């Protein structure tokens, strides 16, 4: 990779690193796992960057790589760890980027998102980023109509989790 390409990558990564943190919060439930996943996603982005063609926004491409990496690692770890009740093992998450008044709500939201399946997690995060259905469909590789249907189901599922 050329120095100019490296600088461009570093700049884009810096501007969009919150995307990686959001994906990590949805697929991990503790700080060490969050850091490990963040590092793995960054490595995968670095490896894949020379193949980035610019046909979509960098952030859209970044989401796709981040989700694929998270899902892949999540599935691998699922095979290695005995399944337990997720809610029993969740600890309060700390979010240093937000003021104290929003911590509890944000923690509850991320716990709810954490309990969703892989596609639903991705949909919820992209929705929270105000992505259009077109952008969501491109990021996840599904049709726009399918994105709308899945999004409505995911919203309903989240409402039921948050307001039992």
Describe each PLM feature range.
Residues 1-22, 26, 35:
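A short, charge-rich alpha-helical start-of-domain segment used by transcription regulators
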Residues 2-3, 42-57, 76-77:
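Sigma70-family region 2
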Residues 36-43, 56-68:
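Structural recognition of an alpha-helix C-terminal capping motif at a helix-to-coil junction
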Residues 41, 65, 123-124, 136-137, ...:
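Hydrophobic positions on the alpha-helical face of helix-turn-helix-like DNA-binding modules
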Residues 51-53, 64-84, 102, 153:
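Arg/Lys-rich amphipathic alpha helix in sigma70-family domain 2
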Residues 80-106, 132-133:
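Internal acidic/polar
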Residues 115-135, 139:
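Short amphipathic alpha helix immediately N-terminal
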Residues 140-164:
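DNA-recognition helix of helix-turn-helix
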């Amino acid at each position: 990779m050329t120095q100019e390409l490296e600088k461009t990558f570093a700049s884009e990564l810096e501007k969009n690193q919150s995307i990686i943190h959001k994906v990590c919060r949805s697929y991990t439930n503790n700080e060490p796992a969050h850091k490990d996943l963040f590092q793995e996603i960054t490595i995968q982005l670095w490896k894949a960057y020379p193949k980035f063609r610019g046909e979509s926004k960098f952030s859209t491409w970044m989401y796709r790589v981040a989700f694929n990496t998270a899902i892949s690692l999540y599935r691998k770890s699922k095979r290695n760890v005995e399944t337990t009740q997720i809610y029993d093992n969740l600890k309060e998450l700390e979010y240093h980027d937000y003021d104290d008044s929003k911590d509890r709500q944000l923690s509850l939201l991320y716990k709810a998102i954490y309990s969703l399946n892989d596609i639903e997690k991705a949909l919820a995060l992209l929705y929270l980023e105000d992505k259009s259905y077109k952008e969501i469909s491109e990021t996840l590789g599904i049709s726009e109509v399918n994105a709308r249907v899945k999004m409505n189901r995911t919203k309903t599922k989240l409402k039921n989790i948050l307001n039992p």
